[in-house]
């Protein structure tokens, strides 16, 4: 049975990737359908109730800079905000919000239901319809067929998902939700390379059974950060603290004594788990020299009694989980509300994707989120946004768009996945980016909002606000450049009181601000440089641009060198077997990866500079040497 309407884009899945993937083409004007097995779990935070963190906060800001939802929802739901690495340089500072699960889900659903060009339908997708290697639509469990020109699959952990608690296991996409078994079988039939990964979650604890009085309290920042460039502190709900406890030798003994009942340590689980979010049993065994691990007790919401014990993800049996929880300070009488578990699921080799997240073998089919081997809400959202954009562009047969590594953390994420692939759940870190001084949270809008405007992703209100900010930055920099202070100035004594060393030669406001002891606030407290600008975002950009000017210019020079051939395109039909001078190993790797550019080829393990030179020579000989944008 065919559904009465035809869509431009269909998105399967209503998680963090799916919601961004559906909103993006709808904002661009494409008729979009979001297909989900349960409309009540749209935007569900399946694991930890938090958004952001090191590297992850950068992704949230980038999604927001292009009109995405995650930052807005985090502002509406954040019950504790912190800036991580606040004492370090601006490149690695990151925003993190503890979120109320219910408020977050409400914010997501409200945005989806009020988005023009977007329909939502509750039904499990069981098949992707393909004709002549081109996607044509989706069929559902009840036999309903939806026609579309492009499809974005964001299945999360649902593809052949299997939940493990102790040595017991059962099919499931997450606790309380069924797995997508039929869809998994269909995708395997398409010949895409598939493997298994696993992730886990800790037991949830009843807050009424925790003795908070004897635990260390962790408050959020006094000056509350805001995630969205369009947001304000007024968006935030009531702020509440988290608490800290620790595992101890008794905890570790409980774990060691029950490893024979662990699905991980008995070989029942075959999928590889996230390296940077290990289970508590993994931590105890891998770091056997440590007799304690810090555990954060994070509230799940303002109206919920559930507490998320961040740091004790486990798949051990329920009685062992009780032993672990009750062995810790403040949790001696704690009661578990929901058991922890591990989940195994299918993921597909991201090297089979273009950097647009379209599959190489099936035109119009895009993958985003955990199906590509990533872990984390933020990584999923960034991929969803990118896949949604390109699903829309594909419909109009327009040139695809994807960010470069020097342009965004999303670009780093996608390039890593599509070039190198992954054998374990991939998460973003600032250390993965070569040009992280340029890829800061604070300048995500400067990097990406003009592109978003060109693509039709943002409204005129956001565009006007962005342009006003850019104008404020330029005007203030020009003002500081034009005001000079000289050694005979009547304001010299006032200035010398705040300068580390007396002024001996004429200096502009920019020159003074470059001094390590000087800040914008101090500078604009001096009579010649009053008044301070009120636009705090613009102030931040002015101060960073001036103080880090030398470092920024150096990185930009490095980027220009790299870009010389970074975007030189390699045609899809380029035959490496006809290129003389390449070793069999290099030829095989290039055929396997099918890089789309010289830059991507150069990052494949084992591809030497000599091999890159040979390819460039052959591209030139064959008249194929074209520079990308």
Swiss-Prot record:
State the InterPro entries in the record. Answer: FAD/NAD-bd_sf (IPR036188), GIDA_C_N (IPR049312), MnmG (IPR004416), MnmG-rel (IPR002218), MnmG-rel_CS (IPR020595), MnmG_C (IPR026904), MnmG_C_subdom (IPR047001), MnmG_C_subdom_sf (IPR044920)
Which residues are recorded as binding FAD? 13-18
**Keyword terms, alphabetized:** Cytoplasm, FAD, Flavoprotein, NAD, tRNA processing
Kindly report the protein's main subcellular placement as a broad class: cytoplasm
| UniProt KW Glycoprotein keyword | no
Which cofactor(s) does the record list?
A: FAD
Which family would the database say this protein is a member of?
Belongs to the MnmG family.
BP term (GO), one: tRNA wobble uridine modification
Where is it located?
Cytoplasm
The UniProt entry's GO CC annotations, sorted and at most eight, read: cytosol
Q: Which residues bind NAD(+)?
A: 273-287
Fetch the Gene3D superfamilies from UniProt.
FAD/NAD(P)-binding domain, GidA associated domain, C-terminal subdomain, tRNA uridine 5-carboxymethylaminomethyl modification enzyme MnmG/GidA
The Swiss-Prot or TrEMBL record annotates one GO molecular function as: flavin adenine dinucleotide binding
The record's section on NCBIfam families has: mnmG_gidA
Quote the Pfam families the UniProt record gives: GIDA, GIDA_C_1st, SAM_GIDA_C
UniProt-recorded name of the protein: tRNA uridine 5-carboxymethylaminomethyl modification enzyme MnmG
The function of this protein is: NAD-binding protein involved in the addition of a carboxymethylaminomethyl (cmnm) group at the wobble position (U34) of certain tRNAs, forming tRNA-cmnm(5)s(2)U34.
């Amino acid at each position: 049975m065919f559904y009465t309407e035809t869509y431009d884009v269909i998105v399967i899945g209503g998680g963090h990737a799916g919601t961004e993937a559906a909103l993006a083409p709808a904002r661009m004007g494409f008729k979009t359908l979001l297909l989900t097995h349960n409309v009540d779990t749209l935007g569900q935070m399946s694991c930890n109730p938090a958004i952001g963190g090191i590297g992850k906060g950068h992704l949230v800001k980038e999604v927001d800079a292009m009109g995405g939802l995650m930052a807005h929802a985090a502002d509406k739901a954040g019950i504790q905000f912190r800036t991580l690495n606040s004492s370090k340089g601006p490149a690695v500072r990151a925003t993190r919000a503890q979120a109320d699960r219910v408020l977050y889900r409400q914010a997501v659903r409200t945005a989806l239901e009020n988005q023009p060009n977007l329909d939502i339908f509750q039904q499990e997708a069981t098949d992707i319809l393909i004709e002549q290697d081109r996607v044509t639509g989706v069929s559902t469990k009840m036999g309903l067929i939806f026609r579309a020109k492009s499809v974005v699959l964001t299945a999360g952990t649902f593809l052949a998902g299997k939940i493990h608690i102790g040595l017991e296991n059962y099919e499931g996409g997450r606790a309380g939700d069924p797995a997508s078994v039929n869809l998994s079988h269909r995708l395997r039939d398409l010949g895409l390379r598939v493997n298994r990964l696993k992730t886990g979650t800790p037991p949830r604890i009843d807050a009424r059974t925790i003795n908070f009085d004897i635990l260390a309290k962790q408050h959020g920042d006094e000056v509350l950060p805001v995630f969205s460039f369009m947001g304000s502190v007024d968006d935030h709900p009531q702020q509440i603290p988290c608490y800290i406890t620790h595992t101890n030798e008794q905890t570790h003994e409980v774990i060691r004594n029950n490893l024979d009942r662990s699905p991980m340590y008995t070989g029942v689980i075959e999928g590889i788990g996230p390296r940077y979010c290990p289970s508590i049993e993994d931590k105890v065994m891998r770091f056997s020299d440590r007799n304690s691990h810090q555990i954060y007790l994070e509230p799940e919401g303002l109206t919920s009694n559930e507490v998320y014990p961040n740091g004790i993800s486990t798949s051990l049996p329920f009685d062992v989980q009780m032993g672990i929880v009750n062995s810790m300070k403040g949790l001696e009488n704690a009661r578990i509300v929901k058991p922890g578990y591990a989940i195994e699921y299918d993921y597909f080799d991201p090297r089979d994707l273009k950097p647009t997240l379209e599959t190489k073998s099936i035109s119009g089919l895009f993958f985003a989120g955990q199906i590509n081997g990533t872990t984390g809400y933020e990584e999923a959202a960034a991929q969803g946004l990118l896949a949604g954009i390109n699903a829309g562009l594909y419909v109009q047969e327009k040139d695809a768009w994807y960010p470069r590594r020097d342009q965004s953390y999303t670009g780093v994420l996608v390039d890593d996945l599509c070039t190198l692939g992954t054998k374990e759940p991939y998460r973003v870190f600032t250390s993965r980016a070569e040009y992280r001084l340029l890829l800061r949270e604070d300048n995500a809008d400067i990097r990406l909002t003009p592109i978003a405007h060109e693509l039709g992703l943002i409204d005129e209100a956001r565009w006007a606000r962005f342009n006003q900010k850019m104008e404020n930055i330029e005007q203030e920099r020009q003002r500081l450049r034009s005001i000079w202070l000289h050694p005979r100035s009547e304001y010299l004594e006032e200035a010398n009181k705040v300068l580390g060393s007396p002024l001996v030669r004429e200096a502009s406001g920019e020159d003074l601000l470059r001094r390590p002891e000087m800040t914008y606030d101090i500078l604009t407290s001096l009579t010649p440089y009053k008044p301070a600008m009120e636009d705090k975002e613009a102030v931040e950009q002015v101060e960073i641009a001036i103080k880090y000017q030398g470092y920024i210019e150096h990185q930009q020079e490095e980027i220009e060198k790299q870009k010389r051939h970074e975007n030189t395109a390699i045609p899809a039909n380029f035959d490496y077997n006809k290129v003389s001078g390449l070793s069999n190993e290099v030829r095989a790797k290039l055929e396997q990866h099918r890089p789309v550019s010289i830059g991507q080829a150069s990052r494949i393990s084992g591809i030497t500079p000599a091999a890159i030179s040979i390819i460039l020579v052959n591209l030139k000989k064959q008249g194929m040497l074209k520079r990308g944008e």
